[in-house]
């Protein structure tokens, strides 16, 4: 393959490597050298773009029972999370002094920790107490984003074996004043299909919300190098799956499509959107579908705890619909979800 007098040799280790993966590899390889369309010559964005808030420079952070100023919050260089990415985390939103969908987030956290034999060292009530204490120390009650992180703890030697983690878990809670930037609701996110895929469960199950995010970081880097904001990741069979940070939906002929869920993160917001569609007579399907079908969607959006529903304006430079991914179905879902959050945190 030749482009701009450069020769790229692509080596595929398996005959099962699908055409969709080849398309993704070509997008990431050559989009850096292609002329960027006018509608893509804008600064890079993220689904986690938030309004700047000076108060976040002075937050207090929970570290193993202590609540300390931001610049004093530290964990050991021997910590399992730092050394190996051995830990789980949850992202949650605080509205009106209540955590949105707290039980669902705890279900995911405790199930994940149980699956990897990580003893949290406290029950749900204990976690809620720690969250409440951290929020109170920061005088926070609304439009707050929390990252709750739990690792296997400090090791006695810098090696992999879990038996070397003998101190008990490390628990960190970071809360920030964090209101999503409204500009993305108008402009939408730009996606690029990337070579990096969400793997099979026998490698590392994508349902784990783990500290080991290198796979997704690589996907994000590939997307940025292709001139996009986030990477659209395929599953091992070449079907559209998820992005590096969020779950992915399209709308075709009034129907909502998302992946089967076999290879994507077990998203709380994703499931809420599916449930809302079913409860409000919006046709919704968890199914395999191709890039061909994604390119031809009338609407597309991402779901996540922080951004709720973020429209997708382009995929691989191709405009989605006539309004940067927005449309009547996604607007209705956004309102239904906002109403559900308000009800859950009333």
Stretch-by-stretch model annotation:
Residues 1-35:
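N-terminal amphipathic/basic-hydrophobic helices that include classical n-h-c signal peptides
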Residues 26, 30-232, 236-239, 265, ...:
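Conserved alpha/beta cores of soluble small-molecule-handling proteins
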Residues 239-260:
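Glycine- and Gly-Pro-enriched alpha-helical subdomains that act as flexible
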Residues 269-271:
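Secondary-structure junction motif
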């Amino acid at each position: 393959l030749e482009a701009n007098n450069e020769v790229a040799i692509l080596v595929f280790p398996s005959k099962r490597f699908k055409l969709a993966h080849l398309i993704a590899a070509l997008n990431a390889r050559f989009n850096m050298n292609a002329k960027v369309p006018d509608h893509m010559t804008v600064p890079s964005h993220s689904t986690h773009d938030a309004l700047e808030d000076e108060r976040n420079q002075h937050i207090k952070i929970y570290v193993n029972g202590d609540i300390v100023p931001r610049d004093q919050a530290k964990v050991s260089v021997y910590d399992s999370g730092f050394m190996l990415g051995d830990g789980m985390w949850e992202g949650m939103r605080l509205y009106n002094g209540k955590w949105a969908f707290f039980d669902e987030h705890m279900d995911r956290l405790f199930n994940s920790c149980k699956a990897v034999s990580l003893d949290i060292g406290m029950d749900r009530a204990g976690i809620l107490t720690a969250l409440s204490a951290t929020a109170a120390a920061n005088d926070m009650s609304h439009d707050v984003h929390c990252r709750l992180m739990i690792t296997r703890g400090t090791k006695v030697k810098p090696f992999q074996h879990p038996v070397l983690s003998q101190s008990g878990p490390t628990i960190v809670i970071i809360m920030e004043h964090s209101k999503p930037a409204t500009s993305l609701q108008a402009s939408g996110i730009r996606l690029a299909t990337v070579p990096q895929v969400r793997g099979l469960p026998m490698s590392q199950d994508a349902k784990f919300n783990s500290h080991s995010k290198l796979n997704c970081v690589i996907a994000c880097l590939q997307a940025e190098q292709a001139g996009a904001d986030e990477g659209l990741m395929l599953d091992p069979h070449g079907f559209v799956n998820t992005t590096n940070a969020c779950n992915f939906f399209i709308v075709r002929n009034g129907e909502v499509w998302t992946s089967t869920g076999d290879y994507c993160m077990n998203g709380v917001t994703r499931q809420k959107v599916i449930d809302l569609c079913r409860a409000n007579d919006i046709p919704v399907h968890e199914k395999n579908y191709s890039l061909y079908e994604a390119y031809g969607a009338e609407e597309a959006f991402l779901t996540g705890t922080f951004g709720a529903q973020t429209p997708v304006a382009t995929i691989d430079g191709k405009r989605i619909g006539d309004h940067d991914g927005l449309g009547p179905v996604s607007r209705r879902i956004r309102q239904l979800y906002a109403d559900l959050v308000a009800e859950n945190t009333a």
